[in-house]
């Protein structure tokens, strides 16, 4: 009998492999993305100190709950880029957390790039 692999287990395996190769600093923090069925979360992390420098999610009050999930992801990317600009962060390392680079992950990344983050 053919068994179907668990998608989340494969994602976590990819995430561990990615995290072994990338790390964020205060000058160039890691932009980590988490995607659930309803929401999307993004944060800028300094791995040297182990602190979150900035964050944004669809649960924030300033991000509209209207529109599609793709539009909401783009709003999160824009909000995170604006917060980063206020803290003089221009360049980041993108951590897609094992998710494939398309859909909501790509929309968030593109919006962050359009609003001033470099990666």
UniProtKB/Swiss-Prot annotation:
Key words, A-Z: Ribonucleoprotein, Ribosomal protein, RNA-binding, rRNA-binding
BP GO annotations: translation
GO terms for cellular component: cytosolic large ribosomal subunit
InterPro entries named in the record: Ribosomal_uL18_bac-type (IPR004389), Ribosomal_uL18_bac/euk (IPR005484)
GO molecular function annotation: 5S rRNA binding; structural constituent of ribosome
Keyword Plastid among UniProt keywords: no
Pfam assignment, any one: Ribosomal_L18p
Keyword Oxidoreductase: no
Superkingdom of the source species: Bacteria
Subunit comment: Part of the 50S ribosomal subunit; part of the 5S rRNA/L5/L18/L25 subcomplex. Contacts the 5S and 23S rRNAs.
Family statement drawn from the similarity comment of this UniProt entry: Belongs to the universal ribosomal protein uL18 family.
Annotated function: This is one of the proteins that bind and probably mediate the attachment of the 5S RNA into the large ribosomal subunit, where it forms part of the central protuberance.
Record-given protein name: Large ribosomal subunit protein uL18
Organism: Lactobacillus johnsonii (strain CNCM I-12250 / La1 / NCC 533)
Gene label: rplR
């Amino acid at each position: 009998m053919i068994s179907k692999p668990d998608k989340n287990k494969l994602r976590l395996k990819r995430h561990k492999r990615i995290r072994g190769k990338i790390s964020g600093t205060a000058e160039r923090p890691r932009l980590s993305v988490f995607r659930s069925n309803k929401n999307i979360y993004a944060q800028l992390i300094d791995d040297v100190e182990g602190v979150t420098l900035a964050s944004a999610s669809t649960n924030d009050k300033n991000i509209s709950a209207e529109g599609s999930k793709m539009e909401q992801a783009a709003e999160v990317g824009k909000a995170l880029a604006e917060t980063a600009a206020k803290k003089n962060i221009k360049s980041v390392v993108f951590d897609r957390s094992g998710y494939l680079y398309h859909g909501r992950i790509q929309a968030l990344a593109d919006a962050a790039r359009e609003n001033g983050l470099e990666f």
